[in-house]
Design a protein with these regions (language model features):
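Basic- and aromatic-enriched surface patches that contact anionic nucleotides/nucleic acids
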Residues: 1-195
Length: 195
């Protein structure tokens, strides 16, 4: 076997292309959204999130891609032996894609983020209504980072002004830094064991 450091963004792109998938024997996506939230929280804090194990097996017939969309590769070149739930979570959130749950139904994972406090929460009505939250961080990942950040800051300024309050320069810097940190999770490096 060999070990390779790969960035989350590289792995997510391999999944999107269909180059990286699951062997047929793997279970469907079973993590509750709270575990996905905790995964993103650990990453933004710089905590390790484990390793991945991939198997290069071009001859394996019974393997499947992740997600519910069509892919460039008809069958994956590599399959995930260990780390399926983490990679599926990252792919679904960073690409805004639905996954199949244990009942084989399409499922959207909604994770909210508060850039002022740098905290994540499972998306629910409060985070949807409260404009200090990015309701679904998938929207940030599939948008242009600069324009997304500026739109968020402008909306937050308007919210504050409607309450007779001001968004300070210090708060703007905190928001900008934390949204940048959110985007930079795509550069988070994982150790990948290839067998």
């Amino acid at each position: 076997f060999s070990t390779t450091p790969l960035q989350v963004g590289q792995l997510v792109n391999k999944i999107e292309l269909g180059e990286l998938g699951l062997p047929e024997l793997q279970r469907p996506f079973i993590w509750p959204d709270s575990k996905v939230r905790d995964l993103f929280d650990s990453m933004i804090k710089g905590y390790p999130i484990g390793y991945l194990m991939l198997w290069d097996c071009p001859e394996l017939d019974k393997k499947k891609t992740i997600g519910v969309d069509e892919h460039s590769y008809p069958t994956p070149k590599e399959v995930i032996i260990d780390g399926q739930q983490r990679l599926t979570s990252l792919y679904a959130v960073m690409k805004g894609k639905k996954v199949k749950n244990q009942k084989y139904e399409d499922k959207e994972i909604v994770i909210s983020f508060n850039p002022l406090k740098c905290i994540f929460e499972v998306g629910f009505q409060m985070t949807k209504r409260d404009k200090e939250w990015i309701y679904n961080i998938s929207d940030a990942y599939i948008s242009n980072s600069w324009s997304f950040t500026n739109n968020y800051i402008n909306n937050l300024k308007q919210l504050r002004e409607s309450k007779g309050l001001e968004l300070t320069n210090e708060e703007i810097q905190i928001v900008s830094n934390n949204i940048t940190a959110l985007y930079n999770l795509q550069n988070f490096t994982l150790t990948v064991f290839n067998i």
